[in-house]
Curated annotation (Swiss-Prot):
BP-aspect Gene Ontology terms: negative regulation of gene silencing by regulatory ncRNA; symbiont-mediated suppression of host innate immune response
Designated name of the protein: Protein V2
Similarity section: Belongs to the geminiviridae protein AV2/V2 family.
Location(s), subcellular: Host cytoplasm, Host perinuclear region
Organism of derivation: Tomato yellow leaf curl Sardinia virus (isolate Spain-2) (TYLCSV)
Lineage: Viruses, Monodnaviria, Shotokuvirae, Cressdnaviricota, Repensiviricetes
């Protein structure tokens, strides 16, 4: 977390608010799995806050707002099944489909037969 005693304060109150909002959203982002809709929307909100000018922030927000309004709480935790083409996306770093559905993991069990 950002330590105000070790780092410089932003030049304006707006900068301080944006910095605190980004730090909060980063903490919320950690509660979502990387391949979920909620994670993607949090990343989009962070990009809205990080926009340098009002027009860019407004354009980004108008793209994010409809997705936020139509998404239910359960949809935010569900995996995203849309194909993604960005190389830095966390969805490309880990594969969900590593194991087949019918294969179960075996556990070592001690021999419990009586002699």
């Amino acid at each position: 977390m950002w330590d105000p005693l070790l780092n410089e304060f932003p030049d304006s109150v707006h900068g301080l608010r944006c910095m605190l909002a980004i730090k909060y959203l980063q903490l919320v982002e950690e509660t979502y799995e990387p391949n979920t809709l909620g994670h993607d929307l949090i990343r989009d909100l962070i990009s809205v806050i990080r926009a340098r000018d009002y027009a860019e922030a407004n354009r980004r927000y108008t793209n994010v707002k409809p997705a936020l309004e139509v998404s239910s709480k359960t949809e935010l935790r569900q995996p995203v099944y849309q194909p993604c083409c960005c190389p830095h996306c966390p969805r490309h770093q880990a594969s969900i489909m590593d194991l087949q559905a019918h294969v179960s993991k075996a556990a070592d069990v001690q021999n419990v037969q009586k002699p």
